[in-house]
Curated annotation (Swiss-Prot):
It comes from Rattus norvegicus. One of its GO terms (cellular component) is extracellular region. Pfam families: DUF4543. Keywords: Secreted, Signal. This is Uncharacterized protein C17orf67 homolog. Transmembrane segments: none annotated. Residues 1-20 form the signal peptide. It is found in: Secreted. Residues 31-50 are annotated as: Disordered. It comes from the Eukaryota. InterPro entries: DUF4543.
Amino acid sequence: MEKLFVLVFALTLLAFSSEASPILTEKQAKQLLRSRRQDRPSKPGFPDEPMREYMHHLLALEHRAEEQFLEHWLNPHCKPHCDRNIVQPV
């Protein structure tokens, strides 16, 4: 019983005194939260925020769709169909 107690005490002391402890100080935790994730390469020009990257992607898709729509409606070769002054877009 005494050996078990000594073993548990030694392991506990080792865990709290070593650098391999899973318990972080407040300063280390804040630094870890501030640091960027490096599990995947980050794109140049984008911060490492997946939601912001996704919103930029959606914005680019919306911009491209608007350009294609205007390209169709402002095409001079299909005048009666695409003239906004005569026909309302469907």
